[in-house]
Swiss-Prot record:
Belongs to the Tom7 family. Residues 41-55 are mitochondrial intermembrane. The chain crosses the membrane at residues 21-40. PANTHER family: MITOCHONDRIAL IMPORT RECEPTOR SUBUNIT TOM7 HOMOLOG. Residues 1-20 are cytoplasmic. Signal peptide: none annotated. Keywords: Membrane, Mitochondrion, Mitochondrion outer membrane, Protein transport, Transmembrane, Transmembrane helix, Transport. Pfam families: Tom7. It comes from Mus musculus. This is Mitochondrial import receptor subunit TOM7 homolog. Forms part of the preprotein translocase complex of the outer mitochondrial membrane (TOM complex) which consists of at least 7 different proteins (TOMM5, TOMM6, TOMM7, TOMM20, TOMM22, TOMM40 and TOMM70). GO terms for cellular component: mitochondrial outer membrane translocase complex; mitochondrion. It is a single-pass membrane protein.
Amino acid sequence: MVKLSKEAKQRLQQLFKGGQFAIRWGFIPLVIYLGFTRGADPGMPEPSVLSLLWG
């Protein structure tokens, strides 16, 4: 196992926490964004913000 200094361990912990934050709060908006940019399947109506909010 590699010996890491206390400062290096803290930096790695910050990096992992930042990655977890980005994944947790960015996944759903990314999926919604990709859904809007790729468009609907053929034969389906185009998605709109109102249909997203009110079903």
